[in-house]
Amino acid sequence: MDITAISLVLFGSTFGLIFRMFIQNNLKINIGFNIQNTSIVNFIASFFLGILLALNLTNNNLLLLFYIGFLGCFSTFSSFIYQLFVLLQKRKFMHLFFHYFEVIIISFICFYLGYYLMQIIK
């Protein structure tokens, strides 16, 4: 990797981290049940991923900046796994089951929405 590639990944990841921390610390959503902020971040990241995939980027610099840098640092798969582990330790198996499917299914729906919207706009 050259210095340009490293700089693009660092730049994208810096903004991904800032955006992630802002959402995790400041956004509270309650729609009858609490959605954890980590889940919200994953939904947004999935939506952005759908948009980026639909754009069919071929510029390597944009891929480094957005896919690897921004989304790589913004999305929180490890936090999602940790939340599942905590639910497992607390023996809250129903919560674990529903949280797992909530995140997977809603993340896929958000991804598809982003992808579909870009297909319409194109």
Swiss-Prot record:
Reaction equation(s) it catalyzes: fluoride(in) = fluoride(out)
Membrane topology value: Multi-pass membrane protein
Taxonomy, superkingdom: Bacteria
Residue spans crossing the bilayer: 3-23, 38-58, 62-82, 93-113
Species assigned in the record: Prochlorococcus marinus (strain MIT 9312)
Annotated InterPro entries: FluC
Gene name in the database record: fluC2
Protein name: Fluoride-specific ion channel FluC 2
Protein purpose: Fluoride-specific ion channel. Important for reducing fluoride concentration in the cell, thus reducing its toxicity.
Cellular localization per UniProt: Cell inner membrane
Entry binding sites for Na(+): G72, S75
